[in-house]
From Swiss-Prot:
Family: Belongs to the UvrC family.
Entry keyword annotation includes Iron-sulfur: no
Gene name for this UniProt entry: uvrC
Protein name: UvrABC system protein C
Top-rank taxon, per record: Bacteria
Primary localization class, coarse: cytoplasm
Organism: Gemmatimonas aurantiaca (strain DSM 14586 / JCM 11422 / NBRC 100505 / T-27)
Single Gene Ontology BP annotation: nucleotide-excision repair
Keyword annotations: Cytoplasm, DNA damage, DNA excision, DNA repair, Excision nuclease, SOS response
Positions of the GIY-YIG domain: 12-91
The UVR domain, residue ranges: 202-237
Length: 616
């Protein structure tokens, strides 16, 4: 039935409506005090509505409505359906995943404490949800350290083991499973766990202190010592708590911040006048929505499902669904303070919300930058186990099989780090064998870093194909360093090979990751060929000088040290060469003549040119 035909038959009752597109996908879930009036308003006020609403109405092809007893029921159902369908036009909690809870099975004779992501109506106590999983883990660690809660899954008292487990031996449990701890004593301890998770640390400390004194009076000094240690740990935890002086003690304080389509709602949980925790939610699809609608949607979708709510909820401003939400919160009163200590708390919560929203925007900006960062792209495209923040690239260079050398250039965060460049002469064998050369160089490079206890690079890049890659892999395996990432880059097709993968990877020509690899490969080639040319030049100079009679290795080194090259020697004067130890004027003249330099004969007479006649 077309939507227009459904409108006249809608009831003027509280309920929830679902707009759907041509494929039956839910576009939007809304609630209404009077369904017919609310749904009709989408067409009656279409020209006055926001661009977002007009875009949704153009896609609407069907309507589903659900009648409920009251506005409070409508609010609850709306939040449930939004979480189920994730409609694209609703204000939604960003990353609305199932956050974990701490579950205490108080419905069992011997309750357990565990983590769960499912909130069930099973009689257990749930604490959370925890957006900060680290905070939840810290709370659980305190519970395990102070309270001897059983960790087994036996359905006590009916199902039980024959003997206590290891937890009993290390005093983490008192073995109620085999009757070493009574049900009454265990339940008293669970009450303290619940108080602790509920933020009533002072009550827990008072109870532990009473039990410690009672144990001392009964001369049970071992038990008294255990309780004393637990009390000391609780006091240490309690000392840094922030005290917020407001009468009444327990309340949740809401802060709100908005930046365009993004919004943040922060809740400070205050118990016994002390700030126990801070939680928050980020919202998306908030464009074209009033702040009141955004705040109400967040509290309905998130805060309403929280287990450990306070009796008072302070919000920064009023919103349309406040009364309906309050009715659904079962004993929590919503207040909008205008001045005084309560308003100061709300202002503090607002400040927290602004800070969290700024952090989120910065994190999003960094994520966008990482998307084009060659280091992150390389890890993503190649599936590398470690982010290649540091990489070393190897290249082999030779001149027609002679003067074989190698280079290792180092890149950090995509940029060359020249202080870490290294060059090598191939020593193990003579001749031209790229595979053996690569094996030798990789072995020498990583062995030296291991010996010097220098950090190893995250990735090694080989200039070459599968053969060079295999040689490098063998070298790393022999050194016991298989955890280092290893790839090779073939020049012709710019194919990237990975050991163990039969097919190469080809990145787009404009890929920042490929350009970074090309830069490293080209830099390694430049560094290697420069060293190879220097080595060849030195060999040429050596052979040329050693052919001259009277010039041995010592004189050759002295000449090269002084003049740098054969050409430098040719351009020197007899006096300059004669000044070098081991040379005299005669040997200097013979050296220059041997190098083909015409040296004037100092013993021949000189002919003076006639002088000009005097001026008359």
């Amino acid at each position: 039935m077309p939507v227009a035909q459904k409108l006249p038959h809608l009831p003027e009752s509280p309920g929830v409506y679902l707009w759907k597109d041509v494929e039956g996908q839910v576009l939007y879930v809304g609630k209404a005090k009077r369904l017919r009036s609310r749904v009709r308003s989408y067409w009656a006020q279409e020209h006055e509505s926001s661009p977002k609403t007009r875009a949704m109405v153009r896609k609407v092809r069907d309507l589903e409505t659900i009648v409920v007893p009251s506005e409070a029921h409508a609010l609850i159902l709306e939040a449930t359906l939004i979480k189920e369908y994730h409609p694209r036009f609703n204000i939604a909690l960003r990353d609305d995943k199932s956050y974990p809870y701490i579950r205490v099975t108080v419905n069992e004779p011997f309750p357990r404490v565990m983590v769960t992501r499912r909130l069930l109506d099973d009689g257990a106590r749930y604490f959370g949800p925890y957006t900060d999983v680290g905070a939840m883990r810290r709370a659980l660690n305190v519970v395990k350290r102070i309270f001897t809660v059983r960790s087994c899954h036996y359905a006590l008292p009916g199902e039980a083991p024959e003997r206590p487990c290891l937890d009993y031996s290390i005093k983490r449990c008192k073995a109620p499973c085999v009757g070493y701890q009574s049900r009454e004593d265990y339940r008293a301890m669970i009450d303290e766990v619940v108080w602790f998770l509920d933020g009533r640390t002072s009550d827990v400390m008072h109870h532990v202190r009473e039990r410690m004194l009672d144990a001392s009076e009964r001369l049970d000094f071992e038990r008294a010592a255990e309780l004393r240690d637990a009390l000391a740990h609780l006091e240490k935890m309690e000392s840094p708590s922030v005290v917020l002086e407001v009468e009444g003690g327990d309340r949740d304080v809401v802060g709100y911040a908005r930046d365009g389509e993004d919004a943040c709602v922060a809740v400070m949980r205050i118990r016994g006048g002390k700030l126990l925790a801070r939680d928050h939610r980020l919202l998306e699809h908030a464009e074209d929505e009033e702040d009141g609608a955004v705040l109400g949607a967040c509290l309905a979708q998130w805060y309403r499902t929280a287990e450990a709510r306070a009796g008072e909820l302070l919000v920064p401003f009023d919103f349309e669904d406040r009364e309906s939400l309050e009715a659904s919160l079962d004993g929590t009163h919503i207040r909008v303070p205008q001045r005084g200590p309560r308003r100061a708390l709300v202002d503090l919560a607002d400040q927290n919300a602004r800070h969290l929203l700024e952090e989120f925007k910065l994190a999003a900006l960094e994520a966008d930058e990482r998307a084009v960062d060659p280091v992150y792209e390389l890890q993503r495209e190649l599936g590398l186990p470690r982010l290649p923040r540091s990489l070393v690239c190897f290249d082999i260079s030779h001149a027609q099989g002679t003067d074989v050398v190698a280079s290792a250039v180092f890149f950090e965060n995509g940029r060359p780090k020249r202080s870490e460049y290294r060059k090598f002469k191939i020593k193990v064998f003579e001749g031209n064998d790229d595979f053996r050369s690569m094996h030798e160089v990789v072995t020498r490079y990583f062995r030296r870093r291991l010996d010097e206890e220098k950090p190893l690079p995250d990735l090694a890049v080989i200039d070459g194909g599968k053969g060079q890659l295999g040689a490098a892999r063998a070298a790393l395996d022999e050194l016991g360093a298989p955890q280092i990432g290893l790839i090779s880059l073939a020049k012709r097709e710019e194919e990237i090979f990975q050991y163990g993968r039969p097919d190469p990877v080809r990145l787009p020509r404009r890929s920042p990751a490929l350009r970074m690899l090309q830069q490293a490969r080209d830099e390694a080639h430049r560094f290697a060929i420069t060293f190879q040319r220097q080595k060849r030049a030195a060999r040429t100079i050596t052979s040329e000088l050693l052919k001259i009679p009277g010039v041995g290795p010592t004189k050759r080194r002295a000449l090269l040290h002084t003049f740098g090259s054969v050409q430098g020697v040719r351009e020197a004067s007899v006096e300059q060469i004669a000044a070098i130890p081991g040379f005299g004027a005669a040997s200097a003249r013979r050296l220059l003549e041997a190098l083909g330099v015409a040296v004037p004969d100092v013993s021949a007479p000189t002919i003076d040119s006639p002088s000009d006649p005097p001026l008359s």
